[in-house]
């Protein structure tokens, strides 16, 4: 980071000497000469604080002489010196002033320079999205054909932001792009600086061998030179190499690289950069048990970071202090430091506008919440009467699925007293449009893109943000409490008891898996208990065994026996400690970590070894707070006018002739139809060899159409297309059902999705792969989404966020609940399950969770489908209470006439019966 920014500043520092001219206006000659002398002196002063003060004196003289060039250069220089002191608010202020000053001089190249500087400033402040915005604006100003140096700086800046925000895979792509640009520019020093940054990014990706190779090559180059900049470059190489060795527990090697650096950084860079290296050295002392020495280093670093307003580093070092005190059993001190760290962390998270940044950030900082919960529970063990188990539960809620919580807020329309409802809806719509464009910008960074693409997105974003500011301003005028009303808060135990488990038949089980210990909270309407579970590693190992056996698509008696044994062992781990508490009819499960991959309905009851589904209705939720938000959103919706919108049996190149030639071709195609609704993520999803017809989806949709009745949308064949999906008004429908192939990429969830028609009626290729980003962009405020495809309930497991995948995407799009699968589901078995599920919902009037349980019990009692592989894979996430509200059909004149005729006939029959009874009694 030091060299990335200093490299930019070094290239700018000569601008004063090279461009400032002698003025002919005699009235201002003396003033300008004094200003020039002071400004020249500021460049000679090594102390950045002193240099900034001298430059401010020069700035005052330039302003009095109305010297626009001197003013612009002074603003720029002062901003640079504040950055060198890690004074980010001041650096931002002066860089913005410099940007305006260069704009007044119509100097496009210098404007690009300042935008790049501002990108680095925002990155250091932790406002990564603003950093990307500045880099994007700079890219829009430069000539891509000629200015490879500037392109390299921009790509390097985006790499820095990606690395800092927890997206090193994006950082690697951008670093490689920057290195290529510097190579084209034939700038050897910058080329090797970027080689160093690639080494650092490889370290973040835990590719330690590749990291050391790149860092050593860069170090060899810098040590071959003999100048001040090269010494700093070499020092940063040593810093990164020290981090690599520390990560591999090679502490002696790490210290060899790290110990000489702080003194050099204090002389040549900044106290903040020196403090960061010292904090890393402190971690080595902590690992070696020298806790007092480590604590002293952390305390000194914390003061530096707080003074520099470096929130990211400050939160990290306070966490380190809390962790250290926790290891010494100083629980009060540990709680204080950890609480401070989490408060700063929450402030940073609140400023993140991107779900990708928020999710990545959550994964990076999850251990802070884990340590805090562990600390509270250790205190609870010592004094159970304090009620710290409640505080620990609320910390667990704070730690999980926060990016989804923020996104759900974006989909909700709040009723604010005194505010125009149309204005509220306009603000909500603009906020979601901004979110969509932001995600598109971040996603674009991860691949090859053209300047025009980023330019268009940035222009649109600027317009949307300006519109949003105006609307928010009006809302604030109408209600000063608007800012507080629109914020999301996590649920307390009392709120959970009042609005989530409000009856005696419901219990919430919230799991938290930790390195030192795991916990489960069992919350009923009038009670809360917490139970200690084995460590995360122990649970993870057993989960892997159970999941592999459950997802086996060819179960037999031997695999079923091994599955039963492993499932009993897992049940003993995660349910055994609370077996006596499982006396409710409904269990809401908030899973954590590997437990997200297990259908709890299959786990055996610790009391009698029967699957939980035999006795309990199982509901899943990302968190209790999100379940409450989903419920609130659903309550605000008007009644639906239609029941079902279903998409399935799409057209692929491989089954095109089937749809053109009719039923006979369909019968032939059925013989080569795959058994599972899954596409291998390594394959090309538009390749005919990987996208084959699923014969049972056609039968499934026919059955659903019969059950749902007239007025439903059943989009099959060529109608099962992207265009129909994106243009359907889902607010009219209660259920969205998708029956097709699913595609899962657990490492890159944005590449997961499902397939609709890949060709049109003329056999022209079309975009039929619906990605997770497409799902996020949908407006889908339905009561229920059913993803009748393979592994649609899975995604990337990110600590603190859970599974990032299609289920999350549809909840953001507006769905109150989602039914999805955890493994490659069998085509025929899924069709059968869906038949019973929909009959239970729409004909028997059961709520979705109850209907799913009944359908799964029906299948498991059928000898053909009794293996859990066939029935246990589907789970329900989200709202569970209410049945699907069927629309009341409008009564036509003809139907009213029939009803009157029938009613009249019944009335005559009733009167005749009364008369006959009276006559019989009289006759008797």
What are these regions (language model features)?
Residues 36-37, 73, 113, 153, ...:
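Residue register of alpha-helical TPR repeats
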Residues 62, 82, 102, 122, ...:
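Eukaryotic all-alpha helical interaction scaffolds
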Residues 135, 456-459, 463, 593-596, ...:
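A domain-level signal for caspase-like cysteine endopeptidase catalytic cores
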Residues 332-613, 632-670, 685, 891-924:
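Amphipathic alpha-helical protein-protein interaction segments
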Residues 488-495, 557-565, 569, 684-751, ...:
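Functional beta-strand-loop-alpha-helix junction segments that form "active/interaction loops"
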Residues 598-621, 663-664, 743-777, 792-799:
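A short, glycine/acidic-enriched catalytic loop
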Residues 744, 749-753, 758-780, 825-924:
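Caspase-like cysteine protease fold
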